[in-house]
Amino acid sequence: MGMMKKSSYNSDLLGQLTLFEDTDKYYLVMGDPKTFNPDKSYYETKLMKDYSNYLDNSYCQGIADKCFEDDKVLIIGAGLGDLTMRLKERGIQSLAIEIDPIIHFLFTDLTHQTCLMMDGTKIFDFYFINEYNHLVIDAFNPTEKRVVHHFIEEGFIKEAVKHFNRITYNTLNMTEKGLKALEDKVRKYAKLRCTITTEHQYKQKVITFVVD
């Protein structure tokens, strides 16, 4: 792996974590860091395959339209590179965290795509989130209900409004009742210091909270 900056963390949920940092790569290893030896070619191949599929659709366009050039965007549940590729084309800096119960380490290439098994609130354990001002939650896949609930719980929202002044949700699979509950939670913890915009386009329903 060459000489990389190495930092160690302890998580109540995940145990020992080691973050390796290179110029354009991050690797977050669970457990003994000596066992870490990722097959980079596998991930690079998979990322490029997903990128070619993504170019044929506008799935991420609705969310990308909510991001501005001066934003630094932290994305949760973004799939393998879809939204990061779209933002990269626009010159917008982003870091994407994929919540995955199978992959037990974090991997990024030049798109800063990441994979990590974690519960939602644990993201606030990592210092690098302070580099980002816009949080995007794109984890609302109906087959991933075990993941979704973390990001609409009060504990997560209470922390999120402390760290980010823009929070965007893909709420395509949320009911109107669920959407209203989400709005109420954000207003509660932002102490009404937020404006809300919603839009229906690109086969998505997107909601953005802007916290003053």
Task: List each language-model region with its residue ranges.
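C-terminal lobe and adjacent flexible extensions of AdoMet/dcAdoMet transferase-like proteins
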Residues: 209-212
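Short, flexible, mixed-charge acidic loops at enzyme active sites
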Residues: 38-43, 132
